[in-house]
């Protein structure tokens, strides 16, 4: 299930890590009872458009009519209004969320973004809500986790650097116990048994303080280009972590992941570099 980290608050996801799912259909009431159940969908949609995500979750459990009204259209006025209230104008105006097809998906991505309370003291999350900025602090490696982690289901997110990589730039996953700051310039993700990472600088896979081989496993693997979006795929059913570049599946990087709550995470060393992470939901192939 999805487990909220610090900063997720009442807006964290449901059992599948969906975030903006507003409750599951199996839990919805069996019918449309009472005055609310008889209200036309357009009236309900108008009322729902003033509610916050936690309130929408409760509404989705009232009856099937309310559930269908909320989930029948992911671009409805309900989700458009919530998206406009929850997300920064910059996030909606730029191409940060260009791969998300609906307002509901954008709200969900925000609930799964970097946590402002679970990152190194040397980084901050920009006003757009999705981009990490590392301050120019010497001899420090700094990371961040997302607000919500996963212990079941299949999940995908994309991450990209918007500045120099430096000597180490790692993307991957971490438990809540993995440190998000250390002295020196090191591969923080993968430095212990609580995190798994791919160093985009030298293409090494890292876990438990050891190099687990190069990735992707091919001759003359291309180096990461600044601005290039890497898709990360976490499968908690098969206990694997895989990566994609563009439309190319690069392969499974890690197998045998533990049955624990795992969070999308990054670590960086270069001063004033920026890293953006956007949660996509369930992988398209699944």
Swiss-Prot record:
Q: What is its main location?
A: secreted
Describe which pathway this protein belongs to, using the record's wording: Protein modification; protein ubiquitination
**What's this protein's family per the entry?**
Belongs to the FBXO45/Fsn family.
Q: Boundaries of each F-box domain copy?
A: 33-82
- Protein name as annotated: F-box/SPRY domain-containing protein 1
Q: In which tissues is it expressed?
A: Expressed speciffically in the central nervous system, including cerebellum, medulla oblongata, olfactory bulb, hippocampus, cortex and brain stem.
What is the stated purpose of this protein? Component of E3 ubiquitin ligase complex consisting of FBXO45, MYCBP2 and SKP1. Functions in substrate recognition but plays also an important role in assembly of the complex. Required for normal neuromuscular synaptogenesis, axon pathfinding and neuronal migration. Regulates neuron migration during brain development through interaction with N-cadherin/CDH2 after secretion via a non-classical mechanism. Plays a role in the regulation of neurotransmission at mature neurons. May control synaptic activity by controlling UNC13A via ubiquitin dependent pathway.
Q: Which domain of life is it from?
A: Eukaryota
B30.2/SPRY domain residues are 92-284
Q: What is a single cellular component term in the Gene Ontology annotation?
A: glutamatergic synapse
How does gene deletion manifest? Answer: Homozygous animals die soon after birth due to respiratory distress. Embryos show abnormal innervation of the diaphragm, impaired synapse formation at neuromuscular junctions, and aberrant development of axon fiber tracts in the brain.
User: Residues where N-acetylalanine occurs?
Assistant: 2
**Molecular function per GO:** ubiquitin-like ligase-substrate adaptor activity
**GO process terms (BP):** anterior commissure morphogenesis; cerebral cortex radially oriented cell migration; cerebral cortex tangential migration; corticospinal tract morphogenesis; DNA damage response; innervation; neuron migration; proteasome-mediated ubiquitin-dependent protein catabolic process
Compartments annotated for it: namely:
Secreted; Postsynaptic cell membrane; Presynaptic cell membrane; Nucleus
CDD domains reported for this sequence: F-box_FBXO45, SPRY_Fbox
Transmembrane among the record's keywords? no
* Keyword annotations from UniProtKB, A to Z: Acetylation, Cell membrane, Cell projection, Developmental protein, Membrane, Neurogenesis, Nucleus, Postsynaptic cell membrane, Secreted, Synapse, Ubl conjugation pathway
Subunit organization = Forms a complex with MYCBP2 and SKP1. Interacts with HEY1; leading to FBXO45 nuclear translocation. Interacts (via SPRY domain) with CDH2.
- Species of origin reads Mus musculus
Show the SMART domains listed in the entry.
Answer: FBOX, SPRY
